[in-house]
Amino acid sequence: MNEIGLGHFLSVAAVLFTLGTLGIFLNRKNVIIILMSIELMLLAVNINLVAFSIYLNDIVGQVFALLVLTVAAAEAAIGLAVLVVFFRNRGTIAVQDINLMKG
């Protein structure tokens, strides 16, 4: 029976990270797609952290992955809240319109 090794985890993480990067570079008009691509990249990083944690028999990578998941959830919630407020004020969430915001 074949065992799933470190190389398999790293390959899946590399594909996910590449898809997230392509999602950011190829779609610059929709902010929600950009946020989803960033979350996909963070998921790939978490897979790497957990894979190396298991491979090295150390729990620090898994703890750090939980920390990254917590921060990513907070980042997504704040980002979506800002988008909802912006959509209510402007009626659009296009990236070129967001560049007009002044603080």
Swiss-Prot record:
Annotated localization: Cell inner membrane
GO cellular component: NADH dehydrogenase complex; plasma membrane
Molecular function per GO: NADH:ubiquinone reductase (non-electrogenic) activity; quinone binding
Highest taxon above the source species: Bacteria
Pfam family, one: Oxidored_q2
Protein EC: 7.1.1.-
Record's keyword terms, sorted: Cell inner membrane, Cell membrane, Membrane, NAD, Quinone, Translocase, Transmembrane, Transmembrane helix, Transport, Ubiquinone
Catalyzed reactions: a quinone + NADH + 5 H(+)(in) = a quinol + NAD(+) + 4 H(+)(out)
Residue ranges of the TM segments: 6-26, 32-52, 67-87
Membrane topology: Multi-pass membrane protein
Cell inner membrane as UniProt keyword: yes
Enzyme class of the recorded protein, top EC level: translocase
Keyword Methyltransferase included in the entry's annotation: no
Biological process annotations from GO: ATP synthesis coupled electron transport
Primary location class: membrane
Classification via PANTHER family: NADH DEHYDROGENASE SUBUNIT 4L-RELATED (PTHR11434:SF21), NADH-UBIQUINONE OXIDOREDUCTASE SUBUNIT ND4L (PTHR11434)
Oligomer status and interactors: NDH-1 is composed of 14 different subunits. Subunits NuoA, H, J, K, L, M, N constitute the membrane sector of the complex.
Functional description taken from the UniProt entry: NDH-1 shuttles electrons from NADH, via FMN and iron-sulfur (Fe-S) centers, to quinones in the respiratory chain. The immediate electron acceptor for the enzyme in this species is believed to be ubiquinone. Couples the redox reaction to proton translocation (for every two electrons transferred, four hydrogen ions are translocated across the cytoplasmic membrane), and thus conserves the redox energy in a proton gradient.
Family: Belongs to the complex I subunit 4L family.
Protein name per its UniProtKB record: NADH-quinone oxidoreductase subunit K 1
Organism for this UniProt entry: Rhodopseudomonas palustris (strain ATCC BAA-98 / CGA009)
